[in-house]
């Protein structure tokens, strides 16, 4: 595979993208930093097909990224391959306003092949290619220039090996008849709503034991205010105000802006500046939530009770058995919420009860719940047996 020098000029990038536009697939990775910002700062993009690979410097002065943007988000004839691509996709969506499509994620593929629950890239490379990757540049400040040879070698290895891994994983999936298993997971991965932080929904991430409509209304307004401030100023939301501070303000709202100086966790200057004024406006304009807007407590665990918790343990044992038999990661078949939903009788839209998941696990899970199957020990091994009707 040809490895190009770091691309910093528009003509070289355009020529590369023109060649890659004829590929069946491209492997993609990004390097970024986000410790001190709300939005991740894109510092490097690595890209490869089965013939060539390059790292692209998005921080290079005057670099026209249009050809790369077109390749990533406007060309749907090329499959885009990532490993654990959630953060890469978030960055691409933020910078281009669109999602790459179609997608393939090698971490999810590895789960479907029973390699591991969330296998890391280096472990996957070592398993399939017998190559041990150098991890020395993992904690690089990718925004610092110039990047040295070791940093660039580390970065480019993220796509050169990925381009080799992808055909191997795809063939194994097809040989095992699992090519379609990933469709639902890839659709979820490509859903832009997975990566967009809606200020109006940000309050739902904050733990709040109080269920009063007026308090929750203030919390919603405060969380939206914080999210917008963080986005506009491009700083982490926690540096605006901690969750606990917002919860306290929602329960004990200050009467005047000058009272903000007494609130622990807020800057004293907010008692008289524009930020404090916007915070007070959020509190004053907050509306109590309507009954239907108040999230229901997670009563599922209470609903299923202690026996339900033990039934969940039995279902998890069954899941572990069937995942082992099928050589697929249990987490890809069913999550705890899916299992609790089965026990609580919530069977509509449960992914476990459709398609291949139903065949591997869901069918027997329902039979176990309905008393039609039971665990038994046969020749020292746990097995499932049908219960014959009297």
UniProtKB/Swiss-Prot annotation:
Record GO biological process: tRNA 3'-end processing
- Residue ranges occupied by any HRDC domain in the UniProt entry: 212-293
HAMAP family in alphabetical order: RNase_D
Signal sequence span per UniProt? none
Q: Which CDD domains match?
A: RNaseD_exo
MF terms in GO: 3'-5' exonuclease activity; nucleic acid binding; nucleotide binding; ribonuclease D activity
Task: Please give the cofactor(s) recorded in the UniProt entry for this protein.
Answer: a divalent metal cation
Q: Which keywords label this protein?
A: Cytoplasm, Exonuclease, Hydrolase, Nuclease, tRNA processing
The free-text function statement in the UniProt record for this protein reads: Exonuclease involved in the 3' processing of various precursor tRNAs. Initiates hydrolysis at the 3'-terminus of an RNA molecule and releases 5'-mononucleotides.
Matching InterPro entries, A to Z?
Answer: 3'-5'_exonuclease_dom, HRDC-like_sf, HRDC_dom, HRDC_dom_sf, RNase_D, RNase_D-like, RNaseH-like_sf, RNaseH_sf
What family does the entry list?
A: Belongs to the RNase D family.
Gene Ontology CC: cytoplasm
Q: Which PROSITE patterns match?
A: HRDC
- Its domain of life reads Bacteria
EC number per UniProt: 3.1.13.5
- The answer to whether UniProt assigns keyword Metal-binding to this entry is no
What reaction does this catalyse?
A: Exonucleolytic cleavage that removes extra residues from the 3'-terminus of tRNA to produce 5'-mononucleotides
**Keyword Nuclease (UniProt):** yes
This protein's name: Ribonuclease D
Q: Which residue range or ranges hold the 3'-5' exonuclease domain?
A: 7-173
Q: Where in the cell is it found?
A: Cytoplasm
